[in-house]
Curated annotation (Swiss-Prot):
Belongs to the methyltransferase superfamily. RNA methyltransferase RsmG family. Pfam families: GidB. One of its GO terms (cellular component) is cytosol. It comes from Lawsonia intracellularis (strain PHE/MN1-00). PANTHER family: S-ADENOSYL-L-METHIONINE-DEPENDENT METHYLTRANSFERASES SUPERFAMILY PROTEIN (PTHR31760:SF0). S-adenosyl-L-methionine binds at residues 86, 91, 137-138, 155. This is Ribosomal RNA small subunit methyltransferase G.
Length: 216
């Protein structure tokens, strides 16, 4: 049985509506492509801890949909350059790019097999100005100019304190860092401040997106 038949378009649309999100026909097609490839590769690579497309949607992809709402509320420049650190299985970046197509978006992943998955996915289901870099974040930052970066996204790349320390040294960075956390961070270094937060709940569990900027 083709794997696409295990992820029906109409069911995806209805399920997304149940979760509170309405997607266009093209977005549903792209989401199905992602779910098909993710569930297929997950059987041999253990990309995510959930095994069915519905549990992947309700526990992981929904974060990306909320992230899109949050990012739209930020005052990003036109055509923003965005970096996604520790992209892994493409979460939150791939579903985010399906529904939020502004600017260019780099998925940075050091683990080769996961980077191959992301490149395979984008070769089969291209997304607007979305690219993959296979290598360490430190190497990626050395090869690119942080002064041009409007947004850095991190879901589970490293502890947020370590990430802020890493970026803190790059004095040219003037953009926003968005973190997915289970609580609003406390005792933030004086080099940073919380610009805004976005709380939401999934299955009774509270989660937060937190936007941070460097203090002047």
């Amino acid at each position: 049985m083709p794997i696409s038949s295990l992820v029906p378009l109409t069911e995806i649309r209805q399920y997304c509506l149940q979760l509170g999100f309405s997607l266009s026909d093209q977005e549903i097609e792209s989401l199905r492509g992602y779910l098909c490839l993710l569930t297929k590769w997950n059987k041999v690579m253990n990309l995510v801890g959930f095994t069915t497309w519905k549990t992947i949607c309700s526990n992981l992809i929904i974060d990306s949909f909320h992230l899109a709402i949050f990012i739209r509320s930020l005052s990003l420049p036109t055509d923003p350059l965005c970096w996604d650190f520790g992209s892994g299985a493409g979460l939150p970046g791939i579903p985010l790019r399906i529904i939020w197509k502004e600017g260019s978006y780099w998925l940075v992943e050091s683990r080769e097999k996961r980077a191959i998955f992301l490149k395979t996915l984008l070769a089969q289901y291209p997304l607007t100005q979305t690219y993959v870099y296979c290598g360490r974040v430190e190497e990626f930052m050395l090869a690119n100019c942080l002064s041009d970066v409007a947004l850095i996204v991190s879901r589970a790349f490293m502890p947020w304190q370590a990430l802020l320390k890493l970026i803190e040294k790059k004095i040219s960075f003037k953009g926003v860092i968005v973190l997915l956390l289970n609580d609003i961070p406390k005792n933030i270094d004086s080099c940073w401040y919380i610009q805004t937060t976005y709380p939401y709940s999934i299955g009774g569990e509270k989660r937060f997106f937190v936007a941070l900027k460097k203090a002047s």
